[in-house]
Amino acid sequence: MNTIIKRFVQQLKISLSTDFWKTLISTLGAVSAVVTLISFVFQVHNPCTLMIVIYFIIVIGGSLIISWLLSRRRDSLKLKLSNTLTVNVNAGDIFDYASDTNYVVIPVNEYFDTVVNTKIVSPSSLHGQFINKYYGYNHIELHEQIENYLTENNVEYIEVTERPNVGGYKKKYPLGTCVPVQVGQVTYVLVALTHFDDEDHAYVELSEFGRCISSVCRFIEKNAGNRPAYMPLMGMGLSRLNQTGQFILKYTLDTIIGVKDLAIPGGLSIIVNPPTAKTLDLNSIKY
């Protein structure tokens, strides 16, 4: 019971926004008109004090409840952008969607590193979590899969002479490069999202970030068929975009919409980690 009350209070706090007050003003007028019409139909003349009090309670109370229901914070979003593209936004753990024959996007760095430590691939990043979850200490196997795919598809790269941290690979691939990795029936799509600077710190420019999103969308369109695809809200972690979750989500959606004639019949879902999801205002996102 306490949890329900706390959730209601939290939702109410979030609802007390400009949208809430706009909705309340219009709802007050509508509810007041309905109550007035009812009193006219039933010929309520010279109402007593009790009737007046009841009238105000119904108008004010009803308006508050209706306004809250209409403007309360949404925790998911479904956007049908075309006959061949529906984008969903949901809160959760991206790995929970790794089932059946789904496509799941994992952002990685431009070297497609597979060594997880505090210097090369952070264990807290999705890149690191993916490696630890499915490959553990057998990261060489993953590296060979990635290398074979990139070689077979003649993906161009730049070979650097050295990197600050020993153990990092030295072939640098263009941002937006996608590599499919099969784990059981699930296809993980590793997408090069970030550069490494001279000290092996990850970063990405906003314009490059947009191109990466476009690239992974095209890859899914080409390969996923009717299978659903899931991607995290990228750019929130170690990529250092230094933008709010709201900005990045809107930018991501705008970029997806801007991909000409994009067709993903199985649907594309953007999965937002719960702490970030709490900061989002999905009510304001409209297309």
Q: What is each model feature region?
A:
Residues 2-287:
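Macrodomain-like recognition of ADP-ribose-binding/processing modules
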